[in-house]
Each structure stands twice: as structure tokens, then as C-alpha cells.
Amino acid sequence: MKAGPIELGEGKSSAPKAAVNRGVAILDFILRILAFIGTLGSAISMATTNETLPFFTQFIRFRAEYDDLPTFTFFVVANGVVSAYLLFSLPFSIFNIVRSKAQNSRILLIILDTAMLGLLSAGASAAAAIVYLAHQGNVRTNWSAICQQFNSFCERISGSLIGSFIGVVVFILLISLSAVALSRHK
């Protein structure tokens, strides 16, 4: 028997495929933890944001809280739901590390990740529009910028957007990774 050169597409491909799929599953797990931290931090940061202007009398005070605007409430709820989902999806991610050939759990994660991406991007985008108005105002509608008066409130709401948009980017990567892992099974 004569041994010839291995051509492209031949040879032992099951062992490297399993190793690559395991590496993808480990990266999936790490990204889920990163997204969990970002979305939970965003929800906590926004939910604990408030500021009272100090220069008014005891009878008249101006106070800014996150729940003054329904958009920020939606932002907190969306980030909280996504954080809970990410926490509960970690066992599926661990299962994919242990059983790198599992397809059904990856399909389930792709479907749920896509739904959570939609929810998170809706909450983050809506809050970003209100944060922009808080910083810039709108001259046409006579909405003045409030960030000149409520400095720490605006800094906190702006900062809470960062973790949420990091979560959006991580979800895009998670969906892409799961799609790559599923395509390698064939």
C-alpha cells in the first residue's frame, strides 16, 4: 500500500473540528459572562441614578430620577431581563463546552440570543435618544438641555449606556460564533 499526499478536504478532520468547536464554546462562555457583567452593571447604574438640585428652597426642589422617564424604566427592565437570561444561559454554554457536538442547545441559544439582542438594542437605543436630548436639548421643540444643571445624573445615565451597547456587540458575536459552530457540524 502506497501512502500518498493528503489532499485538501481529506484526512483526520474530526479531532481538529472538535477542538475548534470546544474553543468556540469556551469563547462563548467567556463572552456570556462579559455581557452579563455589562448589562447588569448598566441596569444597576441606571436604576440607582438620581440627583437633587441644591439651590432651591425647602418647598421647591428639582429632582431627576431614572424613573421620571418611561424610556429609562424600559432600559432598566430590558437590561435586567437580558442579564437574567445570560445568567440562565450559562449552563447551556457549559454543556456546549462538555459536548462540543451538541446542536440542539446551540440552535436554542441562537434563537434566544437573537430575541435578547432585539430587546437589548431597543432599550439601549431608546435610552440613547433621551440621553442625547438631555445633553443637547432640542431648539425646535423648546426642550432645553438639562445636563448643565444635573451633572452627575447625566454622567451616570451616559455611562450606563456603555455597558448596554457592549452587550449588544457581544450578542452579535455570540450569534456569529454559534452560527460558525453549527456550520462546522456538517
Swiss-Prot record:
GO terms for biological process: cell wall modification; cell-cell junction assembly. It is found in: Cell membrane. It comes from Populus trichocarpa. One of its GO terms (cellular component) is plasma membrane. Homodimer and heterodimers. Pfam families: CASP_dom. Glycans are attached at N50, N142. It comes from the Eukaryota. Its main location: membrane. The keyword Membrane applies. NCBIfam families: A_tha_TIGR01569. It is a multi-pass membrane protein. Belongs to the Casparian strip membrane proteins (CASP) family. Residues 45-73, 128-160 are extracellular. Regulates membrane-cell wall junctions and localized cell wall deposition. Required for establishment of the Casparian strip membrane domain (CSD) and the subsequent formation of Casparian strips, a cell wall modification of the root endodermis that determines an apoplastic barrier between the intraorganismal apoplasm and the extraorganismal apoplasm and prevents lateral diffusion. The chain crosses the membrane at residues 24-44, 74-94, 107-127, 161-181. This is Casparian strip membrane protein 6. InterPro entries: CASP/CASPL, CASP_dom, CASPL. Coiled coil: none annotated. Residues 1-23, 95-106, 182-186 are cytoplasmic. Keywords: Cell membrane, Cell wall biogenesis/degradation, Glycoprotein, Membrane, Transmembrane, Transmembrane helix.
